[in-house]
Amino acid sequence: MRIEEDLKLGFKDVLIRPKRSTLKSRSDVELERQFTFKHSGQSWSGVPIIAANMDTVGTFSMASALASFDILTAVHKHYSVEEWQAFINNSSADVLKHVMVSTGTSDADFEKTKQILDLNSALNFVCIDVANGYSEHFVQFVAKAREAWPTKTICAGNVVTGEMCEELILSGADIVKVGIGPGSVCTTRVKTGVGYPQLSAVIECADAAHGLGGMIVSDGGCTTPGDVAKAFGGGADFVMLGGMLAGHEESGGRIVEENGEKFMLFYGMSSESAMKRHVGGVAEYRAAEGKTVKLPLRGPVENTARDILGGLRSACTYVGASRLKELTKRTTFIRVQEQENRIFNNL
C-alpha cells in the first residue's frame, strides 16, 4: 500500500484564467479540427465532441442530428445488424463518417462488429468500450481488433493513468477513452472506491498519449459547456458527453409520466436498469455501478449542441485562441473554491 500525496483535480476545482486576445468576435473561432490517426492512417475533420455510447444517448437519431454539427456519435452496441443495415440505407455518407461503431470484448461482440463494419466502408470508427480498461483481456482484444481492422480508427477505454494509456496505444488504439467514475449516472466511485478526478486524468493521459502520437477522449464529468472547455484546455483531443445530451427527442430513453408531467429515463450502462434490459438482470457476483434518473424532456438536441459550441467558442475568445487546437496552449488553470454565484439557483 502507498499514498500519492500530490493533489488530483476535477473540473469543479479550477477555472481558466483569461488572457489578452486579438479576436473581435466568437464567430472568428474555428472549432473544427483535422486529425490523422496513428495506426489507421485515416484522416477526419470535424468538431471533436462525441455523443456517448449509452443506449439513452448514442442512438441512430442522435447520430443523424449531430452530424449536421460535424459532431461524432458513438452508437451504442445494442442495435442488431439488421437495424444497422436499415440505418445505413437511410443515411448519407456524410452522416456515416460521424459514426462510431461500439463494441464489447466478447467473441460474439467481435463477430457482430465485423458484420456491421462489412455493411458499409464509410464506417471508419470502432469504439471498444469496457468499464475497466486495465485487464489483460482488454489489451489483447484491442490488439486483435487492430489486426482485424488495420484501416479502422480504434477508440478504446476506459483508463485514467498514463502507463495504461501508453499500453493501449502500443496495442493498436488510435484514441484512448479516459475516465473512471466521473459520469452523471455512474456510481463506480462509491460502490468500489476506485476512480480518478477527471481533469488530472485528462492531463496525465494526454501527456502520455501525445508522446506516442496517440490521442485521448475525455469521457465523463462534464456538466456545463465550461467543463467541455476545461477538458480541451487540459489536453483532450476529443470530449465525450452523456448526461449533457440525455433527455432529448433523439436520446431514445423511455418516457414516463408523473403527476401529469413527462420525463425521460436516463441510466448508466452498469446500472440495474441497463442490465435488466440487456442481460436479464444483475448477476449475483456483481453490484450495479450506475443509477437511473428521470429527466424533464429537453426538446431537440440541436438547441443543446448550439449552446455547447457557443460556450466553447466563447472560452476560446477569453484566452485568445482563434482555433480549438490552440486552446490547450493558451490555457492556464487556476485552483478555486467557487465556480458560480448560486443565489438564484433554486428559483
Curated annotation (Swiss-Prot):
Its EC number is 1.7.1.7. Signal peptide: none annotated. Keywords: Metal-binding, NADP, Oxidoreductase, Potassium. The keyword Metal-binding applies. Pfam families: IMPDH. It catalyses: IMP + NH4(+) + NADP(+) = GMP + NADPH + 2 H(+). It comes from the Bacteria. K(+) binds at G181, G183. PROSITE patterns: IMP_DH_GMP_RED. One of its GO terms (cellular component) is cytosol. NADP(+) binds at residues 108-131, 216-239. SUPFAM superfamilies: Inosine monophosphate dehydrogenase (IMPDH) (SSF51412). Gene3D superfamilies: Aldolase class I (3.20.20.70). One of its GO terms (biological process) is purine nucleotide metabolic process. Homotetramer. Catalyzes the irreversible NADPH-dependent deamination of GMP to IMP. It functions in the conversion of nucleobase, nucleoside and nucleotide derivatives of G to A nucleotides, and in maintaining the intracellular balance of A and G nucleotides. NCBIfam families: GMP_reduct_1, PRK05096.1. This is GMP reductase. It comes from Escherichia coli O81 (strain ED1a). The gene is guaC.
